[in-house]
Swiss-Prot record:
Entry-linked PANTHER family: ORNITHINE CARBAMOYLTRANSFERASE, ORNITHINE CARBAMOYLTRANSFERASE, MITOCHONDRIAL
Pathway assigned in UniProt: Amino-acid degradation; L-arginine degradation via ADI pathway; carbamoyl phosphate from L-arginine: step 2/2
GO biological process, alphabetically ordered: arginine biosynthetic process via ornithine; arginine catabolic process to ornithine; citrulline biosynthetic process; L-arginine biosynthetic process
Binding site residues for carbamoyl phosphate: 57-60, 84, 108, 136-139, 275-276, 322
Protein name: Ornithine carbamoyltransferase, catabolic
UniProt keyword Cytoplasm, yes or no: yes
Major location category of this protein: cytoplasm
Amino acid sequence: MAFNLRNRNFLKMLDFTPREIRYLLDLSRDLKRAKYSGTEQQHLKGKNVALIFEKTSTRTRCAFEVACFDQGANVSYIGPSGSQIGHKESMKDTARVLGRMYDAIEYRGYSQDMVEHELAAYAGVPVYNGLTDEYHPTQMLADVLTMWEHSDKPISQISYTYLGDARNNMGNSLLVIGSKLGMDVRIGAPKHLWPTDELVAECREIAKRTGARITLTEDPKEAVKGTDFIHTDVWVSMGEPAEVWAERIRLLKPYQVNSALMAASGNPQVKFMHCLPAFHNSETKVGKEISAQYPELANGIEVTEDVFESEACIAFEQAENRMHTIKAILVSTLGD
């Protein structure tokens, strides 16, 4: 290893250099190949990892658990209703307890400030951000690995567009990772749903060093013109009240990823990406409720069924890569 990531926290991509990020991507690819070929070696035997989930999860939980199992580590799942965190015990105290029992801690919840200044500051062991309201760093490694696998271009020449509410963890994180890796990053959203001015300014400074191209626009067609990949996410995030749906639909309807917007890219090879879960039809409880009020969205909210079920959709490859990239984080920070 050209540099040492051992015992490092993984809290946000801003904390890592481009070389460190590329190393994690290379390691992810190597570990994926080893799993597929049956030659994987275990580097985490005897390690114990705690998984704290204040928000529910399918992909993040499964990815961490399988990555740990594959590498010989043990895991303990601490769910939203299965602990004293925030009820009878502060996160600071929880960190000091778990840090004495576990070799690393994953956290998925709400506050970025809390995971950085309480959990990571007091645990004494590596802490991994499985998602907060502000950032989703493990998803970013999976997203870039997926784009790398589905493009003939060097990473720095890949272009991608994020459409939707860009103030959330996905919008913020896609802006950061692209600026770090010198990519062509486009954000298409109403202006007051853009990332904060402070984060945009920080990413533009990073882009001066890496050669990244950053575009923020309110025009969805401008955002996707010539792009290689189109990303979106749900329009209402976990923890937000249901009452915000009406306003969010009004604002974001022009940014729905449908066949017309895919075609507007002018790129017949353009791919669609989504961190999941996606409301691409009315088969889910939320989908049924929304389509009952907005019949025009019965065929999908942020993405339409025809796009999601098309060959252009690589969301499930993207989901699989959560496990390979999380495994790379674990091996590089905890491995023997």
